[in-house]
Amino acid sequence: MELSYYEILEVEKHSNQETIKKSYRKLALKYHPDRNAGDKEAEEKFKLINEAYGVLSDEKKRALYDRYGKKGLNQAGASQGDFSDFFEDLGSFFEDAFGFGARGSKRQKSSIAPDYLQTLELSFKEAVFGCKKTIKVQYQSVCESCDGTGAKDKALETCKQCNGQGQVFMRQGFMSFAQTCGACQGKGKIVKTPCQACKGKTYILKDEEIDAIIPEGIDDQNRMVLKNKGNEYEKGKRGDLYLEAQVKEDEHFKREGCDLFIKAPVFFTTIALGHTIKVPSLKGDELELKIPRNARDKQTFAFRNEGVKHPESSYRGSLIVELQVIYPKSLNKEQQELLEKLHASFGYEGEPHKSVLETCISKIKDWFK
């Protein structure tokens, strides 16, 4: 079944232009040929995304499409319409994202991605309190033997597929747009004989140790950036290194944002009588929790400003204690007798089920009279 233009752009039919453009840009980046070299499926999706956006970004064409579908567009001659605004927007977008425009105004770009992402493993303690950590990284550096050309003796030939433009023009339905040349990957030049040092990759890998300051309160999947510690995309110029935290869980504390949760096991007699217990604090001292009589299982109590500090502000969350009522697994003879006496001492109050269930039983019996 053919997808609608709305389904292709992953938006609702009532979506406004801002939502449509935002979704288009996200999908165009995801499936762009520069990021999916040799992937035919991604290439087809990229074509469909552009075709869909070419219609939905134009209110007149969108109205025709909503009423008559693709046939209505063709019959109305929409394929001959003015797409200058669309291409202008498309060109500026890809100029920023990939280094070239939609109409062939290309600037030379390195095959090395400036920025890269690395996982940073942290213990619960390191994440909560922050720390200084030495990180081992491996980054891409411009090959000195070929000056990043990937070619032996730096000898490059003009690409015959695109005549050195780095782009080829394609037509999809009533859409016409530029696409990165697959033969030269948008460079306009091709390698005849690969460089022996980098095997034609244009870069070599270098190891480095970096001292990073981990902020107090960083959370799992949070990212921090180390400027100028990424790949060397041009001689002497490096991108940024992004570190994504992977925080190990603690056996006692559970974390949700800046709030900490801890379960406090308490015996059932403590719930009946009320009691004061000690609760651990991140600050190293002990907090007193006064459990009121007849507290409930899973009831929570919050200590404000005893949680985790926000990594980018002075805000600090809460420590939330959840009661976990524990009952004895077995009773000895003396305990059994004591509990039976205690139960009997409550009289009718000790059997609250009777007032509810016996009334219900009587009601049901009346139904069958």
From Swiss-Prot:
<feature type="zinc finger region" description="CR-type">
    <location>
        <begin position="130"/>
        <end position="207"/>
    </location>
</feature>
<comment type="function">
    <text>Participates actively in the response to hyperosmotic and heat shock by preventing the aggregation of stress-denatured proteins and by disaggregating proteins, also in an autonomous, DnaK-independent fashion. Unfolded proteins bind initially to DnaJ; upon interaction with the DnaJ-bound protein, DnaK hydrolyzes its bound ATP, resulting in the formation of a stable complex. GrpE releases ADP from DnaK; ATP binding to DnaK triggers the release of the substrate protein, thus completing the reaction cycle.</text>
</comment>
<keyword id="KW-0677">Repeat</keyword>
<dbReference type="InterPro" id="IPR036869">
    <property type="entry name" value="J_dom_sf"/>
</dbReference>
<dbReference type="GO" id="GO:0051085">
    <property type="term" value="P:chaperone cofactor-dependent protein refolding"/>
</dbReference>
<feature type="binding site">
    <location>
        <position position="146"/>
    </location>
    <ligand>
        <name>Zn(2+) 1</name>
    </ligand>
</feature>
<feature type="binding site">
    <location>
        <position position="195"/>
    </location>
    <ligand>
        <name>Zn(2+) 1</name>
    </ligand>
</feature>
<dbReference type="InterPro" id="IPR001305">
    <property type="entry name" value="HSP_DnaJ_Cys-rich_dom"/>
</dbReference>
<dbReference type="InterPro" id="IPR012724">
    <property type="entry name" value="DnaJ"/>
</dbReference>
<dbReference type="GO" id="GO:0031072">
    <property type="term" value="F:heat shock protein binding"/>
</dbReference>
<feature type="binding site">
    <location>
        <position position="198"/>
    </location>
    <ligand>
        <name>Zn(2+) 1</name>
    </ligand>
</feature>
<dbReference type="Pfam" id="PF01556">
    <property type="entry name" value="DnaJ_C"/>
</dbReference>
<feature type="repeat" description="CXXCXGXG motif">
    <location>
        <begin position="181"/>
        <end position="188"/>
    </location>
</feature>
<feature type="repeat" description="CXXCXGXG motif">
    <location>
        <begin position="143"/>
        <end position="150"/>
    </location>
</feature>
<dbReference type="InterPro" id="IPR001623">
    <property type="entry name" value="DnaJ_domain"/>
</dbReference>
<dbReference type="GO" id="GO:0005524">
    <property type="term" value="F:ATP binding"/>
</dbReference>
<feature type="binding site">
    <location>
        <position position="181"/>
    </location>
    <ligand>
        <name>Zn(2+) 2</name>
    </ligand>
</feature>
<dbReference type="InterPro" id="IPR008971">
    <property type="entry name" value="HSP40/DnaJ_pept-bd"/>
</dbReference>
<feature type="binding site">
    <location>
        <position position="159"/>
    </location>
    <ligand>
        <name>Zn(2+) 2</name>
    </ligand>
</feature>
<dbReference type="GO" id="GO:0006260">
    <property type="term" value="P:DNA replication"/>
</dbReference>
<feature type="repeat" description="CXXCXGXG motif">
    <location>
        <begin position="195"/>
        <end position="202"/>
    </location>
</feature>
<keyword id="KW-0963">Cytoplasm</keyword>
<dbReference type="GO" id="GO:0051082">
    <property type="term" value="F:unfolded protein binding"/>
</dbReference>
<dbReference type="InterPro" id="IPR002939">
    <property type="entry name" value="DnaJ_C"/>
</dbReference>
<dbReference type="Pfam" id="PF00226">
    <property type="entry name" value="DnaJ"/>
</dbReference>
<keyword id="KW-0346">Stress response</keyword>
<keyword id="KW-0235">DNA replication</keyword>
<dbReference type="Pfam" id="PF00684">
    <property type="entry name" value="DnaJ_CXXCXGXG"/>
</dbReference>
<protein>
    <recommendedName>
        <fullName>Chaperone protein DnaJ</fullName>
    </recommendedName>
</protein>
<feature type="domain" description="J">
    <location>
        <begin position="4"/>
        <end position="69"/>
    </location>
</feature>
<keyword id="KW-0479">Metal-binding</keyword>
<comment type="similarity">
    <text>Belongs to the DnaJ family.</text>
</comment>
<comment type="subunit">
    <text>Homodimer.</text>
</comment>
<feature type="binding site">
    <location>
        <position position="162"/>
    </location>
    <ligand>
        <name>Zn(2+) 2</name>
    </ligand>
</feature>
<feature type="repeat" description="CXXCXGXG motif">
    <location>
        <begin position="159"/>
        <end position="166"/>
    </location>
</feature>
<dbReference type="InterPro" id="IPR036410">
    <property type="entry name" value="HSP_DnaJ_Cys-rich_dom_sf"/>
</dbReference>
<keyword id="KW-0862">Zinc</keyword>
<dbReference type="GO" id="GO:0009408">
    <property type="term" value="P:response to heat"/>
</dbReference>
<keyword id="KW-0863">Zinc-finger</keyword>
<keyword id="KW-0143">Chaperone</keyword>
<dbReference type="GO" id="GO:0042026">
    <property type="term" value="P:protein refolding"/>
</dbReference>
<dbReference type="GO" id="GO:0008270">
    <property type="term" value="F:zinc ion binding"/>
</dbReference>
